[in-house]
Amino acid sequence: MWAGSRLEFYQPLTVEADVTCVSTIINVEEKHGRTGSLLFVTVRHEYFQDGKRALQDEQDIVYREPTPPKLSGTEAIPQGQWRDPVVPSPTLLFRYSAVTFNGHRIHYDWPYVTQTEGYPGLVVHGPLIATLNLRAFTKAHPNARLKRFTFRGVRPLISPQPFEVGGRLIDSGKAQLWAGNQDGTAQIGEVEFSLGETP
């Protein structure tokens, strides 16, 4: 399961130009928690165009023993300066799985996710929530140039239950982002940015 990511934006990617991705496993750590053994794997993906690094994405992925899913949050979602409502349809989840080459059945196979994994419905991808959060941020701040974006999953969101993404400025060039619903916060994040034209 996706635990979180740290993205660094160095330069924009050019459409219709070749991109090289170099992926490296940078850390593997076993931990023991309330739900049993957990294996944390951190993978770094670096994207290059014309020999220059354009984007770096460090992903934290957790492998765990089968356990009942925790669906309730610990904190209510805050009131933000901007927010977008989302209704995650099964079609949206299927398409996101396809475009990201994500074959994990919890996102599109209803019998599997409900009968084998024990969730009440299809699980919304953590990166999809992050993508929707960045979209809401850039709609609210169209002149922002992204520098860094980090996010961490708190609990799963289930399709087709509505949720919202939103955020607020916390400093010059920094914003706090979140996603959640009536059950509480599901994802938290932070974006660093500068204002002005994209190079």
Kindly label every feature range from the protein language model.
Residues 1, 6, 12, 27, ...:
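Residue-level preference for alpha-helix termini and adjacent loops
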Residues 9-13, 21-22, 87-88, 95-98, ...:
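Generic detector of short, locally flexible boundary/turn motifs and exposed helical patches
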Residues 11, 29-31, 105-106, 139-140, ...:
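Short secondary-structure boundary micro-motifs
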Residues 49-50, 61-124, 138:
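Catalytic strand-loop segment that frames the active site of acyl-thioester-processing enzymes
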